[in-house]
Structures are given as structure tokens and as C-alpha cells.
């Protein structure tokens, strides 16, 4: 419609009246459109008269009035423009309405989306809270269960302690009464004890203390080993005379006895030496008491005021004849037999091989002494003066060497190499005897074959303070190669050679028997050849036996060579040669009988 208006304006400018007429005709044709728009005009425009654009009315308008037509056309143009503006406003209003509706819908959708997201977040948070609460509840339950278990364990472990506390809180009056009785009995029995044992107890109060301590400890539990205790038993009339502990609660006694048993079980290993050290200490104390009693009997005038007479008497007795020494040795042997019989028998069963680990490091040196002293019996066969020398040596060194070697030497096996060891031991002890007789004391140079705990009697009397435990190696490595180890290795090698020789002889005899059986099957023409073969074999055996004998003599000379003055002659093994000749003669006789 706007296009028609623009066309009409351009047409008016070119053709004045003709264009106007055509325009009016067109406007009449569109009269129907104007009627429709008229209802949409505002109220202020209703006063304007509607245009009559119909073409039928063209004849009714006078043609000669151009001014009126122009006015009418201008009015129509204005109306058209107004209509266009109104339409624009309507379109804009509709657009705005639609835009507002769309924005509202979009906002509603956004709000709904936000609400959904918020609800989802809230659900997630609730789930997380629920999970956390569950975890906290589970942790609390676990803690409660652990606490209950701990309480149950404590209740199971500590009912005895509560009972002990209750029992300990009771015995106060009984303790006081027993202490008073003990003090009274001690004060009453102190005078006769001091009068009877003034000689030994006065100089050695430590022995009395150890005896009392052992009685207090060993009343509740029996001694762990079969040895006799180190204290003297009280007289039967004084049964109430016993030392008490600080607390007289009964469970404490049980605990101490159990602890003692545990310690004994733990220290049953041969590497540990506490169990043996108790026995050895008691044995040393008894030897010391016997020595004192012998000194006091030899010099009855001497008492507590003259303690230096003991070592002088002992040194004087070293130079006395052998008969006085033998009586003392017998006393010591009988006394030691009661204490160390079981231990000596157990030590005899040990295998002392230098190739094996040193298991007996924690024990005393009695094992080596048992090995060396077992040769006294054989020495009595070869040398009748050896037992006398051994007895005199033992008497002169009775304070340092334990008497178990004298007791076990009566049951030793015969062995030539052990005789060599005994001779070396006697020589070393004679050297130390000369040093003692001259007035010196051997401190640095001691024989490796002698005992480790050797102490002179004078030093034993003068040494009152307790000694430290001797240090020992803690490794299980074999001992260094000493003279004992070398001799043992040589002895084993010689035994191996003898066994090999016997095996070869047995093989040779089997061959001879097989040949004899074959010759019996063959004709009699080969008998002379068989006899010659047998004669040649006998000659070969005699030569081999002579060679072996010369080798054995050379080996003994080599063994005794490094020791210098020590040489032991070994007799040739005649028994084996006699057995060989006897077997050969029997074979010849059997062969001759079969031939005939």
C-alpha cells in the first residue's frame, strides 16, 4: 500500500490532473480496506469524514475544481500515513508482548532448573551426611569393642595382683611377732655359736652371712641341683633360729621360688656358667676350710691371732715326705667325691674334638684335665714310678688343681699318647714346684695344660676380697692349634692308617682264597706254580709290614721331636704279624690236605 502511495506521488509530480484522477480511481477501488481500518481508528479521528474512493462516483465530482481535489488528496495521504504509523505501533506492541511472554517463560524455566539443581545438591548433601554419620557410628562401635576387650584382658590379667595386694595388707602383727622372736633367739644363741666357731667364723664373717642368706632363700624351695649346700645345718634344738625376709607375705615366697626355677632352667646351657660357678665356689670354700682345719691341727697353738701360720705350714708341707701328703689327698678326694661326682661323670661323656665348635667354653678346665689324667693307669704299666710322681704332684698342688683328676684317673683307658701328655703335665708342674721352692710365684708363665683357676694356698688365704668372673671367648669357633689338638689329630690319622691297612689285608686274603679255589679246579700240574705265588705273596706281606713298622717308628719320633726331651718308645704290633702267619699256615695246611 505504501508502494502505491509513493507511485501516486511520483505520478502527481509528472502529470498533474490526469494523475490525480487515476489516483482517485485507485482509491475508490480500495474503499473496502478503508472501511475495515476505520473501526481501528481512535476516537479523536471519527469526526473526519471518510473518503470515498470508489470509481463510480468519479462523474459526480466536478472536474473543474482542482483545488478541492488537491486538498482531498492531501487529506487522504495524511490519513494513509497515520494508518501506517498506527500499524507500526500495533506491530511493535505485539512484538513487545511476545517478547515479554518469552522472557517470562525463559525465567520460569531458569527458576525451575535452578530449583532442580538445588534439590539435587540438597539430596547429595543429605546422602553425605548420612554416610558420615554411619562411619562415625561404626568407629564408635569399634572403639567401644576395643575398650571392652582391653578391659576384659586387664580383668583377666590382674585379679591375682589384687588378691596379692589384699593379702599383703593383712600380715603386719605376725611380722612384728616373728621379728621379735627372731631377735630374741639370735641374742640367746649368739654366745655358744661364737664360742664354738671363734676360730673360723671370727676371721671369716662372710661365710656366716652366706650361710644365713642361703637358709633364708632355700627354706621355701628345694635346691636346684643334687649338691650339698654351702652352709652348716643348725642344731635340732634351735629350729626357731632362722633369718626372716623383710616382708612375710606368703605369695612372695612362691614368686621367688618360681623365679629360681626359671633361672635354673634358663641357665642349663653349657655356655652359661652360673650353675657351675655356684658349685665351684662352694667347693673352693670347702677346700679352704679343710686347709684351715689341717693347718690348725698341725699347729694347735696358733689361733685367730696368728693367721700367717697357714701358708708357712703349707709351704713346709710341700717339702715333707709323700706319706703325709697322701693322707691329705685322700681326705680331699673323699670330700670332693660328694660334691663333684655327677658333674665329673657328665664331663667324661663330652667329645673333645678340635674340629667341632667349642661348646664347653663356659665350663671349667676339668674336661681337659680328665683327658690328660686318664693316662695314669697306662703309665702304671709302662713306668712304675709314674703314680708316685703323680701323687706327690697332686699333694704339692692340692690347693690349685681340683682332685677330680685323681679320682677319674683310676678309670682311664690305656693310650700311649695320653702317657705323653701326662709326662708333659708332670714336667710343667715340677718346674712350678721348683719356682715355689725358690720363693717366687708363677704369675705370667703357666702351662696351657693346667687348670685356669689355679691359685696357691698362701694366695688363697690372703685373698679375702671377691674375685671377678674370668673372661672367656663368646664365639663358637674352634680352639687354636695347641699341643693337645696336634696330638689328637695325629692319633686320629694313625687310627685311619691302621684301618686302611686292615682293609687292604682283608682284600688280599680274599684274593688268595679265590686263587686257591681256582687252582683246585685246575689240574695238578699247576700246584708248584701256586706254591711259588703264595711264597712270593708272603714275602711281599713281610716287606710291607716291616715298612709300616719303620713308618710308625718315624712318626713317633717326629711327634716327640718338637718337645725336645720327651721321647716315648712304642713296641711294634706283633699281634697282627702273628695273626697273619697263623692264617697263612692254616691256608697252607688246608691246601695240602685238598691236594692229597
UniProtKB/Swiss-Prot annotation:
Subcellular location: Nucleus
Enzymatic reactions: N(6)-acetyl-L-lysyl-[histone] + H2O = L-lysyl-[histone] + acetate
A matching Pfam family: HDAC4_Gln
Lineage: Eukaryota, Metazoa, Chordata, Craniata, Vertebrata
Record's compositionally biased regions (Basic and acidic residues): 132-153, 160-172, 522-536, 567-585
Oligomeric and partner information: Homodimer. Interacts with mef2.
Cysteine-cysteine disulfides: none
Protein's UniProt name: Histone deacetylase 9
Expressing tissues: Broadly expressed.
InterPro entries: Hist_deacetylase_Gln_rich_N
GO cellular component terms, semicolon-separated: nucleus
Protein family according to the UniProt entry: Belongs to the histone deacetylase family. HD type 2 subfamily.
Primary enzyme class: hydrolase
Span list, region Disordered: 132-172, 214-258, 293-313, 522-596
Molecular function terms, GO-annotated: histone deacetylase activity, hydrolytic mechanism
EC number: 3.5.1.98
Compositionally biased tracts (Polar residues): 541-558, 586-596
CDD domains per the UniProt record, alphabetical: ClassIIa_HDAC9_Gln-rich-N (cd10163)
Signal peptide residue numbers: none
Region (Interaction with mef2): 172-222
Low complexity composition-biased segments: 293-312
Keyword tags: Chromatin regulator, Hydrolase, Nucleus, Repressor, Transcription, Transcription regulation
Amino acid at each position: 500500500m505504501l508502494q502505491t502511495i509513493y507511485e501516486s506521488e511520483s505520478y502527481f509530480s509528472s502529470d498533474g490532473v490526469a494523475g490525480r484522477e487515476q489516483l482517485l480511481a485507485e482509491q475508490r477501488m480500495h474503499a473496502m480496506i478503508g472501511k475495515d481500518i476505520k473501526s481501528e481508528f481512535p476516537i479523536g479521528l471519527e469526526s473526519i469524514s471518510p473518503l470515498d474512493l470508489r470509481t463510480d462516483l468519479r462523474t459526480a465530482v466536478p472536474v473543474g475544481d482542482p483545488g478541492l481535489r488537491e486538498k482531498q488528496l492531501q487529506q487522504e495521504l495524511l490519513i494513509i500515513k497515520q494508518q501506517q504509523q498506527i500499524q507500526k505501533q500495533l506491530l511493535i506492541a505485539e512484538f513487545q508482548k511476545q517478547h515479554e511472554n518469552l522472557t517470562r517463560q525463559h525465567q520460569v524455566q531458569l527458576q525451575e532448573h535452578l530449583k532442580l539443581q538445588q534439590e539435587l545438591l540438597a539430596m547429595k548433601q543429605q546422602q553425605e551426611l548420612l554416610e558420615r554419620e554411619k562411619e562415625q557410628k561404626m568407629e564408635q562401635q569399634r572403639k567401644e569393642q576395643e575398650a571392652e576387650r582391653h578391659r576384659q584382658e586387664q580383668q583377666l590379667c590382674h585379679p591375682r595382683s589384687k588378691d596379692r595386694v589384699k593379702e599383703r595388707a593383712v600380715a603386719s602383727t605376725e611380722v612384728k611377732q616373728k621379728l621379735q622372736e627372731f631377735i630374741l633367739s639370735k641374742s640367746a644363741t649368739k654366745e655358744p655359736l661364737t664360742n664354738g666357731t671363734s676360730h673360723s667364723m671370727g676371721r671369716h664373717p662372710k661365710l656366716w652371712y652366706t650361710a644365713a642368706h642361703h637358709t633364708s632363700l632355700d627354706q621355701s624351695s628345694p635346691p636346684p641341683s643334687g649338691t650339698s649346700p654351702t652352709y652348716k645345718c643348725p642344731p635340732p634344738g634351735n629350729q626357731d633360729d632362722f633369718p626372716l625376709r623383710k616382708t612375710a607375705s606368703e605369695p612372695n615366697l612362691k614368686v621367688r621360688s618360681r623365679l629360681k626355677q626359671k633361672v635354673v632352667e634358663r641357665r642349663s646351657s653349657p655356655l652359661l656358667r652360673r650353675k657351675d660357678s655356684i658349685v665351684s665356689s662352694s667347693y673352693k670354700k670347702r677346700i679352704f676350710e679343710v686347709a684351715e682345719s689341717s693347718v690348725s691341727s698341725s699347729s694347735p697353738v696358733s689361733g685367730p691371732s696368728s693367721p700367717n701360720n697357714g701358708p708357712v705350714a703349707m709351704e713346709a708341707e710341700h717339702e715333707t715326705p709323700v706319706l703325709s701328703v697322701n693322707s691329705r689327698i685322700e681326705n680331699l678326694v673323699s670330700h670332693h667325691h660328694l660334691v663333684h661326682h655327677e658333674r665329673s661323670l657328665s664331663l667324661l661323656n663330652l667329645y673333645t674334638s678340635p674340629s667341632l665348635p667349642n661348646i664347653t667354653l663356659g665350663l671349667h678346665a676339668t674336661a681337659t684335665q680328665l683327658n690328660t689324667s686318664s693316662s695314669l693307669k697306662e703309665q702304671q704299666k709302662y713306668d712304675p714310678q709314674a703314680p708316685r710322681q703323680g701323687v706327690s704332684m697332686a699333694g704339692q698342688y692340692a690347693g690349685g688343681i681340683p682332685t677330680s683328676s685323681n679320682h677319674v684317673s683310676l678309670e682311664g683307658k690305656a693310650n700311649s699318647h695320653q702317657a705323653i701328655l701326662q709326662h708333659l703335665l708332670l714336667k710343667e708342674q715340677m718346674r712350678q714346684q721348683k719356682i715355689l721352692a725358690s720363693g717366687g710365684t708363677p704369675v705370667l708363665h703357666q702351662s696351657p695344660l693346667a687348670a685356669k683357676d689355679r691359685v696357691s694356698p698362701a694366695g688363697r688365704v690372703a685373698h679375702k676380697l671377691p674375685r671377678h668372673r674370668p673372661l672367656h671367648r663368646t664365639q663358637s669357633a674352634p680352639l687354636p692349634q695347641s699341643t693337645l689338638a696336634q696330638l689328637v689329630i695325629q692319633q686320629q690319622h694313625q687310627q685311619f692308617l691302621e684301618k686302611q691297612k686292615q682293609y687292604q689285608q682283608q682284600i688280599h686274603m680274599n684274593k688268595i682264597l679265590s686263587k686257591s679255589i681256582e687252582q683246585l679246579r685246575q689240574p695238578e700240574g699247576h700246584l708248584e706254580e701256586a706254591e711259588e705265588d703264595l711264597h712270593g705273596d708272603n714275602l711281599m706281606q713281610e716287606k710291607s709290614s716291616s715298612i709300616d713298622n719303620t713308618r710308625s717308628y718315624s712318626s713317633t719320633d717326629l711327634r716327640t721331636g718338637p718337645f725336645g726331651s720327651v721321647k716315648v718308645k712304642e713296641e711294634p704290633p706283633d699281634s697282627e704279624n702273628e695273626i697273619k702267619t697263623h692264617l697263612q699256615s692254616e691256608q697252607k695246611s688246608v691246601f695240602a690236605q685238598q691236594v692229597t
